[in-house]
Swiss-Prot record:
Protein name, entry field: Forkhead box protein B1
DNA-binding region boundaries: 12-103
Main location: nucleus
Species name: Homo sapiens (Human)
Function of the protein: Transcription factor expressed by neural progenitor cells in specific regions of the embryonic neuroepithelium. Essential for the mammillary nuclei maintenance. Negatively regulates the proliferation of oligodendrocyte progenitors and promotes oligodendrocyte maturation. Also expressed in mammary glands, plays a role in lactation, controls development of mammary glands and the inferior colliculi of the midbrain in the central nervous system that regulates the milk-ejection reflex.
Amino acid sequence: MPRPGRNTYSDQKPPYSYISLTAMAIQSSPEKMLPLSEIYKFIMDRFPYYRENTQRWQNSLRHNLSFNDCFIKIPRRPDQPGKGSFWALHPSCGDMFENGSFLRRRKRFKVLKSDHLAPSKPADAAQYLQQQAKLRLSALAASGTHLPQMPAAAYNLGGVAQPSGFKHPFAIENIIAREYKMPGGLAFSAMQPVPAAYPLPNQLTTMGSSLGTGWPHVYGSAGMIDSATPISMASGDYSAYGVPLKPLCHAAGQTLPAIPVPIKPTPAAVPALPALPAPIPTLLSNSPPSLSPTSSQTATSQSSPATPSETLTSPASALHSVAVH
């Protein structure tokens, strides 16, 4: 036999769960829905125990409202004063309590993911959806916002929406169809060929003929490039970049490079300096070997003939020795 309910309780804690207390407050309303503040007020008016430590049990009650499927949240209509949404019981959880008593629950009410916040019965589902649609339309009308105009093809659920005429510039059709152009506006086919870093085999003869007038010592009568002499085009003579290696370095039967290089001047014979005056050799011969740092060099120079390079350096050595003495 279920325990009889009482309208009021003393300061002791009532034997009801937070779900039972919330459901009791919602069902006591004539509209079967209440805001959160009215739920708090109903519980505190009926059960004096919850008039103390309000923050603790109100937080627990809010968690039960949010994480239990038996409660649904209904937005407030624009014509209703106040703020906050309403909380109501799910239409399918009417038999959640045994014999109408809030002390016992049959089982935890759970809504499937595919049917979340939607009633199981078709009639209740249609009524619930119509009510939600009316609330949203009235809220939009009060706020002054307009629904965006969608094309008719968007509402055709049976067919496929026709693609629009606009195509993204990076679509595959545009990439294939359009002509590749440079940033300056010229196509690749209209560009001039870029000259190679080294002359190609068919350009060596023209380069030699054009440079022959400016380089007579290289492209003279014994020029390095002869138009009558064919240049070898064997596959082994070419590098990985298509530039011939052998014609650039040495042609057949030639010892000088084909590319013009600066030619160093040949050193001419330096004329012999005039003979030293008589007093300087006399002083050098009379000086002792220990005082003359160049006595060994002087003896060597007297025993062997002087070369041109020694002739260039001997006056400086002689003058240095005279200054020391």
